[in-house]
């Protein structure tokens, strides 16, 4: 019991640091740090976006904003979004954007301190918590072959940001910061300004992305910390240490009545969920809950998840957002792969004295397949081919030098080949290589006002091979024994998971 109290409660020395967050909003370097972080994030992406914040950000505006913050009421910043603010003399959208980005930097301070301190106290290697997203697949290879059913669901987003503000009160003791956060939220009272709904997921608007990412990650952290604990408690039926978690979730006096009712029946509910072979995996806004049990057990977890979100976070999950699949019959759309468990049979010859027996041996194996059709659709959206998969030229790159054009196409192919190196069937990557290579040739031919055949005849096909074969050469130097048995062209058969990938490939987001 004391262990979970220490997990839930902040140290007094650390909680006092949270009382002094608001004065940081009056420091110029906070906004400069927020602007610098955004510039680094955008420079690492494939496409650079120019926003109003980039075009209008300056230290002079920040100084004027800080001066007015000390003189005026918070609500004076947000009285009018379209016209000039009489106190500031500028459009309030720019000021609110700068203030939001600075506010996120301030809020990240106590959470980063808590993470670092927890790692130091537990002596946990930092790389253990910051490992590659490709580490999920070796876990699937080891665990999923022994499981039967998987619950594939999208984590529901919060209905109202006020719920998150109330949750933040547990972590941030600074009342002034919370009041300012409420003022910023009321400015975006229209939910469509914050979140754009899609068929299977949702995305944040570009103007508020950094702010909403922080709130959403905090929402997921709260959900996982409680749900994971309750899931673990299903194997310890006599434990009552789940009560502090319920006190942490039900915000103060608003839910006391329901809390009393729920805790009385909670221990009986956990009895029906006892499953020592339950595994939980989260990636982006999706999650998997896999079980070795029967369909009835995973269906109970399905019902429990819906009630868990509704009662704890006031979030509703649509029926189509949760799917129960049998691993032997269905494929999972996981991180750009189609993953499934298939039975593979082999014959073993056994001889005892003069008798010879043939024994059929069946084993399960995880198959990870590249979804070629959605990937071609992503290439088509990026203007590398048409919707049918026929390569086309890239006119916007025709003004670059030949080396820059080849380097861009080669880098895109190497990134795709690097990301999908763990595929069980790599023949589909030949199709992707063909599209990117011919698109590069057509772009070069367009630049030199020639045909593809005439251009390749004049320069030779070795001009493109040098760049597209770099990935295979790196692999052959790293794994010489495996590469000796690889297929022609360097596309090896065995899955190789690169554990240095920390973000999903842009072309793997088939949305």
Swiss-Prot record:
Keywords on this record? Chloroplast, mRNA processing, Plastid, RNA-binding, tRNA processing
InterPro entries registered for this protein in UniProt: Domain_X, Maturase_MatK, Maturase_MatK_N
Sequence similarity: Belongs to the intron maturase 2 family. MatK subfamily.
Q: Which GO terms describe its cellular component?
A: chloroplast
Q: Which organism is it from?
A: Primula veris
Top-rank taxon = Eukaryota
- Compartments (UniProt record): Plastid, Chloroplast
Q: Name one Pfam family in it.
A: MatK_N
Biological process (GO) annotations held by this record are: mRNA processing; RNA splicing; tRNA processing
Q: In its UniProt entry, what is this protein called?
A: Maturase K
**Transport among keywords:** no
Any GO MF annotation of the entry: RNA binding
Chain's role: Usually encoded in the trnK tRNA gene intron. Probably assists in splicing its own and other chloroplast group II introns.
